[in-house]
Amino acid sequence: METKRNQQRNQDGRTDGVRDGDSAAKRMEEGRLYFPGDEDILKEQMECMELLYDYNATRPRESARRTGLLKQMFGSIGRDCYIEPPLHSNWGGRHVYMGDFVYANFNLTLVDDGEIYIGSHCMIGPNVTIATAGHPVEPGLRRKGIQFNMPVHIGENVWIGAGAVVVPGVTIGDNSVIGAGSVVTRDIPANVVAVGNPCRVLREIGERDRMYYYKDRKIDM
């Protein structure tokens, strides 16, 4: 677990060597390089993880309790959102900002060290990962566990298929569909179907999509 590994690094006396006097928390908030094993960061993070544990321990019929917990956990969350447990998150959703009517299937992983914005009416398949955290390529900094975060923006009415991965700094436009298993490494425009590793635009959403919902099956409602 990342938090436990950072705790060990902290105990070993490995620090980021920052000389400007800014706290790790301030550097984290500003998207700069920082040491995630900082004691103050870990203390705040642990409080978030306790709420996440409570969420994942709810019984199937405790939907009202889950809704209440999400309001405590997330940076903000709109109405009628549903996230199937288990939910995995570095900060328990503290840096997640979600609109209305969002559905996420089980095993959603939110690496929310940085901000994640998810628009209204989004659907997220099982085993999707949305990550904001990265590490420098430079070996010396990585050896010290140094990290940086880049926000992810997902527009409204986006469908992300099962097993997709969205990496730090990516924006996905409104109404787009991300195919199952895709790895989204760059921005995806609005109103397109995009698939693959790396994820690329396959086509625009068009007239045929308004006539057929699957292959030759016509929309009848």
Language-model region placement:
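Short-chain dehydrogenase/reductase
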Residues: W159, V177, V193-V195
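Flexible, glycine/small-residue-enriched loop-and-beta-strand segment within the central core
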Residues: P60, P85-T171, N197-C199, R203-K215
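Short hydrophobic beta-strand element within catalytic cores of glycosyltransferases
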Residues: V184-T185
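Short alpha-helix at the nucleotide-sugar/activated-sugar donor binding site of glycosyltransferases
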Residues: M123, S176-V177
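Conserved catalytic segment of ABC-fold P-loop ATPases
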Residues: G173-S176, P189-N191
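Terminal amphipathic alpha-helical/low-complexity segments used for targeting or macromolecular assembly
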Residues: M1-D80, C199-M221
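Short conserved AdoMet
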Residues: G78, G155, P189
